[in-house]
Amino acid sequence: TIYIGGGTPSIIDAKYIEKVMAKLQEKNALITAKEITIEVNPGTVTEEKLKTYKKIGINRLSIGLQSTDNNILKTIGRIHSYEDFLNTYKLARNQGFGNINVDLMIGLPNQKISDIKSSLEKITELKPEHISVYSLIVEENTPIEKMLNIGKLELPDEELERNMYWYVKNVLELNGYKHYEISNFAKEGYE
């Protein structure tokens, strides 16, 4: 497995990703790689980038959605909307990507179980092969931390976040996703 991520690699020109893949090819690192993933942000990926990714052998996308609620996305500083995500997802499918992960988050400011329910309904309808669900970790000196400190934002309490997690787990399992790691759920064969 090769994973190009740890941020938003889709923000840079695809030619740089192409160069990375060429170097890996030179070192024979691609010979045994069955899965080559790149993280993409719906606000920074284009149809041209997706075409390039597919052409150079990337066969899995991890799309950082986080929530289908545009107000929550704005609150956490995301540059995309749910509609941007849908466009990216459809473009990826049209380019032949048959293995897509969607990242969701729980424990976001002002998030409720009803928000999680709505996100899960919309995402499971799309039938991605993989869904990752992460809890928000508030980092020091970030805009979210500053707004929490002055009372402009509120995080769900621990019990609500725990209930969100169990709700997600149950809904995804009912929709045919196998829970194989703490934050990861996949259709059979995509673990």
For every predicted segment, state its role.
Residues 1-191:
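C-terminal scaffold of the Radical SAM
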